[in-house]
């Protein structure tokens, strides 16, 4: 039998639907006939240092100099205070001028002209990071001494030394002191930095000690005074569990706190920062917020909703209106094709649903909508989100993130009127366009009841006003920012947990016609939006409405999304104005300690708003194994973070009494034909890579190594996945420009068309506009362009350190990927050893208990498409969730799967990447992992989607691993990663040579060299 990938109109998704985290570069959604790929973890992300992290990992030495011009500037410093050096190239008197600033950014003075002449070249070419401390003489009138340390990459040491020699300066040995007192905690009675402490007295901790300390880092959070419980506001209907009451009490106390921030203390009339020794007269702003880092599945969303309703101003609950029960609610008849409020008028069934599952897509419903405003946006969504079993859905359309709303499967008790035609009928003359955002907002917040009949007050009118909100009014609105994938979950959670007669002004800021009036948005109780919308508005000309408002509270869901400080998304978040700030994340540190800085900067924790002070006082000392740095980190984390895991105990009982989770490995033996193909590809690849080892060029050919590993992993799943089109021969010096281009494009197609979850080694996120360098490494275009810009004029590849140039970056034309996919679409389908094992397990499970639901997970989305065929043939009802699906289809798929009625899907085909964020799939109690991931944390995140709050059955996970294959070797690497995970943030970062050697050893392990 022949088969094809054919689901939606081909070019519907080839568009700039979402903006990635890098500003104006769009994240493309490729046509659905492209091989399905969502990139993650082909390269283990922990193994690579980004350019800014690597830049100051080696201490070159120290230099004494002087700060002059003190009488001309208002900035002051204390003895032993850290200062920052800043280039001032536009200085009219000296193009080499270098400012000396205190922690507040106020200029204290400048370097003497001769010294500035030597250092300007080093700073401009980013050869070293130069850091200063004023050891004494802070009260001098004209000049003060400055002790400077030089940090950089080992390869730049000689260039720095030569530049200084040219100007008559010479670096001294590593200083006898570090410029901060390791014994000084942030609550001590003396200033932090002190030159009295010899550097050799610093305690260098072993990897094992650091691992133990990091294990304790979050454990200690459970043992202190965060055990007080608090009942939520009366408007909350769902009873809180004890750990949620504790979190509520802690969050309310943080929001109302009058304490000084960590590392600050008052001495007479001054406020001292004890780690930089900076002081000022103005009291530093309190940190009204923190990080709620509870494990996934412990109900952080409900806790956040409780905080919003419980703690408004002056410790009082949010003032709310009650809806009278005798209000009449109109219900109208909906014609079959009446509900298309935005996007394309398609009537297709859910992407990936089998025929039997189509019952999940019934007629959508929406309540009556009235226009009451003179604004083009007719009405804010000003009623409580409706309690429902189903979620609002969205569809991506051709020119922007347009939205379609509908209800999912339910037996409709009433009938609704054709909203579209009615809206048109009432619209002003000359405005016949349906206003999607009006219908969308109201659809989110009012719909036909699914259980009880509930009376909803129809909304407040939009009030005309100026763009600026009244500065004298105390802010009212909470802004919630989340990934698109969990937008519908927030709406559902508000509907589920708030009492039926409570009226909230709730607006979903999303879609092409969203209200952009700050005066109107600031009148809401809650505004909900996505990171992409926030970033898009931030990058457009004119003021972003969300940045024109001072919010009462900003909540970041999946807050680790801002971990990349260079991303436009992070900058957009950090620029928001708010009284209170919260980060919700189960993984505050994902890859390294540097992930924390953006979160601390978002919380406005002075002096860490400036990355330099975080790096100098905590990040670098901790990563170099310094005990004092670790102690500061522990104090900081303990102050601003609350974390409980599923194994945490409250009053002797587990926080969450979940059923047991068991993991089994089922070994698969390849058939003779599969083994023959596997061995042939392996032998050919080993010969080529062995030659690279002998020549010492293995990392220069890293794309070839990745290609071989991908092909071996694909054969383990299904030989159909094998990509033969790519030659393993790397670029040679004899290639013409056109031959080189073709070879590089072929290499990139190998990675992109594999259906794997590839990540960029710079930002550790999914590839955004992938490009390949002449040294055959694939990165996000905005990421690698930023590296090139930062390292001008001598930019080097972050992976192999070869020279790279922006002009030589190559993008893969989408039509080439399409052609490759079309060539394969008519092939005959055959099974594989893994598919046989899966089908045997599923069939056996159905015989024992036909109601048990299963997740079938793979990184290769093309493999999921292959699995669909035997599932259909065997009569299984299944649905699918992967990153290529529009949000509407995703929500529909999840709701169908979570439905417990007879005939609902018992299997979900899930891509590993799509299963990693914010989903609740607790209906499933069986997981079949078809192929191992490089990063075990990615697997664990996926497993947590079903092993979470609401799970009533024992969860059994089966990993299919092919015997005598690259998959068994991947398990060895996974185990190493698990062992290092707890201590990874505290262990000393490897230098470039150590990192390369570790990578080489890993390659040897994987291909048995």
Curated annotation (Swiss-Prot):
Q: Any idea where the Helicase C-terminal domain is?
A: 837-996
- Residue ranges of the region described as Disordered: 336-365
GO CC annotation, single: nucleoplasm
Which GO molecular function annotations are given, in alphabetical order? ATP binding; ATP-dependent activity, acting on DNA; DNA binding; helicase activity; hydrolase activity, acting on acid anhydrides, in phosphorus-containing anhydrides; RNA binding; ubiquitin protein ligase activity; ubiquitin protein ligase binding
Compositional bias segments (type: Basic and acidic residues): 348-359
Q: Which InterPro entries is this protein grouped with?
A: Helicase_ATP-bd, Helicase_C-like, HIRAN, P-loop_NTPase, SNF2-like_sf, SNF2/RAD54-like_C, SNF2_N, SNF2_RAD54_helicase_TF
Tissue-by-tissue expression: Expressed in brain, heart, kidney, liver, lung, pancreas, placenta and skeletal muscle.
Q: Where is this cross-link: Glycyl lysine isopeptide (Lys-Gly) (interchain with G-Cter in SUMO2)?
A: 112, 211
Q: List residues, modification Phosphothreonine.
A: 736
Q: Which SUPFAM superfamilies match?
A: P-loop containing nucleoside triphosphate hydrolases (SSF52540), RING/U-box (SSF57850)
Q: What else is known?
A: Subject to frequent epigenetic inactivation by promoter methylation in colon cancer.
Occurrences of domain Helicase ATP-binding (ranges): 435-606
Q: What is this protein called?
A: Helicase-like transcription factor
Protein's organism:
Homo sapiens
Locate the motif DEGH box: 557-560
Q: Where are the zinc fingers (RING-type)?
A: 760-801
Alphabetically sorted, this entry's keywords are: Activator, ATP-binding, Chromatin regulator, Cytoplasm, DNA-binding, Helicase, Hydrolase, Isopeptide bond, Metal-binding, Methylation, Multifunctional enzyme, Nucleotide-binding, Nucleus, Phosphoprotein, Transcription, Transferase, Ubl conjugation, Ubl conjugation pathway, Zinc, Zinc-finger
- Entry EC number(s): 2.3.2.27, 3.6.4.-
Gene3D superfamilies tied to this protein = 3.30.70.2330, P-loop containing nucleotide triphosphate hydrolases, Tandem AAA-ATPase domain, Zinc/RING finger domain, C3HC4 (zinc finger)
Q: In what pathway does it function?
A: Protein modification; protein ubiquitination
- As annotated, the DNA-binding region falls at 38-287
For the biological process aspect of GO, one term held by this record is: regulation of neurogenesis
User: Which stretches does the entry tag as region Interaction with SP1 and SP3?
Assistant: 925-1009
Q: Which residues carry this modification: Omega-N-methylarginine?
A: 27
Protein's UniProt keywords contain Membrane? no
Tell where it localizes: Cytoplasm; Nucleus; Nucleus, Nucleolus; Nucleus, Nucleoplasm
């Amino acid at each position: 039998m022949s088969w094809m990938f054919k689901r939606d109109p081909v070019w519907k998704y080839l568009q700039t639907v979402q903006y990635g985290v890098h500003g104006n570069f769009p994240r493309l959604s490729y046509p659905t006939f492209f091989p399905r790929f969502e990139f993650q973890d082909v390269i283990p992300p922990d193994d690579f240092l980004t350019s800014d992290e690597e830049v100051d990992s080696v201490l070159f030495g120290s230099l004494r100099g002087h700060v002059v011009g003190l009488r001309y500037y208002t900035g002051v410093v204390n003895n032993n205070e850290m200062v920052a050096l800043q280039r001032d190239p536009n200085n009219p008197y000296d193009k080499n001028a270098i400012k000396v600033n205190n922690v507040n950014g106020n200029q204290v003075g400048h370097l003497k002209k001769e010294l500035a002449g030597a250092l300007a070249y080093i700073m401009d070419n980013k050869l070293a990071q130069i850091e200063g401390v004023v050891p004494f003489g802070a009260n001098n009138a004209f000049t003060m001494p400055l002790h400077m340390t030089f940090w950089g990459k080992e390869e730049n040491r000689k260039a720095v030394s030569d530049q200084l020699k040219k100007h008559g300066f010479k670096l001294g040995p590593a200083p006898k002191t570090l410029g901060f007192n390791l014994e000084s905690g942030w609550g001590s009675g003396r200033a932090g930095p002190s030159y009295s402490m010899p550097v050799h007295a610093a305690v260098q901790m072993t990897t094992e000690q650091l691992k133990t300390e990091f294990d304790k880092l979050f454990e200690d959070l459970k043992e202190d005074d965060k055990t007080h419980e608090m009942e939520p506001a009366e408007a909350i209907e769902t009873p809180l569990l004890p750990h949620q009451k504790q979190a509520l009490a802690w969050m309310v106390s943080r929001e109302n706190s009058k304490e000084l921030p960590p590392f600050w203390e008052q001495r007479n009339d001054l406020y001292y920062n004890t780690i930089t020794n900076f002081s000022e007269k103005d009291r530093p702003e309190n940190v009204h917020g923190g990080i709620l880092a509870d494990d996934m599945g412990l109900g952080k969303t409900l806790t956040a909703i409780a905080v919003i309703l419980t703690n408004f101003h002056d410790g009082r609950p949010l003032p709310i209106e009650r809806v009278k029960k005798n209000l009449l609610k109109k219900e109208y008849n909906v014609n079959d094709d009446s509900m298309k409020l935005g996007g394309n008028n398609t009537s297709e069934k859910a992407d990936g649903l089998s025929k039997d599952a189509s019952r999940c897509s019934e007629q959508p419903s929406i309540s009556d909508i009235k226009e009451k405003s003179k604004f083009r946006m007719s009405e804010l969504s000003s009623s409580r989100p409706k309690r429902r079993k189903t979620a609002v859905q969205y569809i991506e359309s051709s020119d922007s993130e347009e939205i379609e709303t509908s209800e999912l499967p339910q037996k409709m008790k009433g009938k609704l009127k054709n909203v579209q035609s009615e809206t048109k009928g009432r619209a002003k003359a000359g405005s016949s366009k349906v206003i999607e955002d009006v219908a969308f907002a109201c659809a989110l917040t009012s719909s036909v009841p699914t259980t009880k009949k509930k009376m909803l007050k129809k909304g407040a009118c939009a009030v005309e006003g100026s763009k600026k909100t009244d500065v004298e009014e105390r802010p009212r609105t909470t802004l919630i920012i989340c990934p698109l994938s969990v937008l519908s979950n927030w709406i559902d959670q508000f509907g589920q947990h708030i009492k039926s007669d409570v009226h909230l002004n709730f607006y979903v800021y999303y879609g092409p016609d969203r209200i952009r009036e700050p005066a109107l948005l600031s009148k809401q109780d809650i505004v909900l939006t996505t990171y992409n919308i926030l970033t898009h508005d931030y990058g457009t000309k004119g003021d972003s409405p969300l940045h024109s408002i001072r919010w009462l509270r900003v909540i970041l869901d999946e807050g680790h999304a801002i971990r990349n400080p260079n991303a436009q998304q992070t900058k957009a978040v950090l620029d928001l104005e708010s009284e209170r700030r919260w980060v919700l994340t189960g993984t505050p540190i994902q890859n390294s300690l540097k992930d924390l800085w953006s979160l601390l900067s978002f919380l406005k924790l002075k002096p860490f708003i400036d990355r330099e002070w975080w790096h100098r006082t905590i990040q670098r000392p901790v990563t170099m194994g310094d005990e004092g740095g670790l102690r500061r980190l522990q104090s900081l984390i303990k102050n601003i973070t609350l974390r409980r895991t599923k194994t945490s105990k409250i009053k002797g009982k587990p926080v969450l009494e979940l059923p047991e989770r068991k993991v089994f490995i089922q070994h698969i033996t390849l058939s003779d034909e599969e083994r023959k193909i596997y061995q042939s590809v392996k032998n050919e690849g080993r010969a080529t890579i062995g030659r690279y080892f002998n020549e010492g060029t293995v990392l220069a050919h890293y794309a070839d190594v990745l290609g071989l590993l991908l092909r071996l992993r694909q054969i383990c799943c299904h030989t159909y996945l094998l990509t033969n089109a790519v030659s393993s021969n790397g670029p040679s010096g004899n290639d013409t420009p056109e031959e080189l281009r073709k070879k590089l494009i072929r290499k990139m197609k190998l990675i992109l068309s594999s259906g794997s979850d590839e990540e960029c080694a710079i930002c550790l996120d999914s590839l955004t506009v992938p490009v390949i360098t002449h040294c055959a490494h694939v990165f996000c275009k905005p990421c690698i362009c930023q590296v090139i810009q930062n390292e001008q004029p001598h930019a080097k590849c972050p992976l192999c350190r070869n020279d790279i140039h922006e002009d030589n970056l190559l993008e893969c034309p989408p039509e080439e990927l399409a052609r490759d996919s079309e060539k394969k679409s008519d092939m005959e389908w055959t099974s594989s050893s893994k598919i046989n094992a899966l089908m045997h397990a599923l069939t056996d499970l159905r015989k024992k208990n036909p109601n048990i639901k299963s997740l079938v997970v793979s990184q290769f989305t093309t493999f999921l498409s292959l699995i669909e065929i035997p599932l259909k043939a065997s009569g299984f009802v299944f649905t699918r969730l992967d990153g290529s699906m529009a949000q509407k289809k995703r929500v529909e798929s999840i709701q169908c799967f979570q439905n417990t009625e007879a005939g609902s899907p018992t299997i979900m085909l899930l891509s590993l990447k799509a299963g990693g964020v914010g989903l609740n799939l607790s209906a499933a109690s069986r997981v079949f992992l078809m192929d191992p991931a490089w990063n075990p944390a990615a697997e664990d995140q996926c497993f947590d989607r079903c092993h979470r709050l609401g799970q009533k059955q024992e969860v059994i996970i089966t990993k299919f691993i092919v015997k005598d294959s690259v998959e068994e070797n991947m398990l060895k690497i996974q185990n190493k990663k698990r062992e290092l995970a707890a201590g990874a943030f505290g262990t000393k970062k490897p230098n470039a040579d150590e990192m390369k050697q570790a990578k080489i050893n890993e390659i040897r392990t994987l291909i048995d060299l």
